[in-house]
Amino acid sequence: MSTYFDLIMIPLQLLIVFFTIYYFTLSFFGLFGRRPEEKIYDEQKTFAMIVCAHNEEQVIGQLVENLHLLNYSDHLYDIFVVADNCKDNTAQIARQAGAIVYERFNDNEKGKGFAMDWMFQRLFEMERQYDAVCVFDADNLVHPDFLREMNSRLCKGERLIQGYLDSKNPNDTWISGVFSISFWVVNHVWHLAKYNIGLSSCLG
């Protein structure tokens, strides 16, 4: 009986030990910051900033205003908001804040994935074509140098880039604090650590 039990438990324990060592080792490469690199701040790339929003009138205006304040030339990026099956004032508020708004209504295809696919089809048919597309949630806020950093990486030949994710209110409640810790772990143990040793990061 114990032999059959060992046949199950020993491989399982070895698997646990392997992943423990893997994550423990990997985490060290994310604890000491980003590896030194040269940055390119000559503004060369154009961006389409896309926000898919469903009934987000409480936050959409803040994000659009935030995107307009980025440290990057206004003529090099446009802000698009997809008001997806909205029943509130999301579209109106986004327009007033200065976004290019597309309203979408489809009772059968609901959700961010459908909205993004719908918007991408229209984006790629526009007369103006962009070097890159940035996707945001309606409740996001963006660092002023976001596009400068994205431009630098695109100029170096990178094609798919994951930005740094963090919470806006880590000290409000214990729940927001836990989310902040999870963001920190993912950013450093997964994204930054893998980047520092030349591995691919996951999108989140």
For the regions a protein language model found, what residue spans apply to each?
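Long helical/loop segments within the catalytic core of UDP-sugar-dependent glycosyltransferases
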Residues: 105, 110-125, 149-204
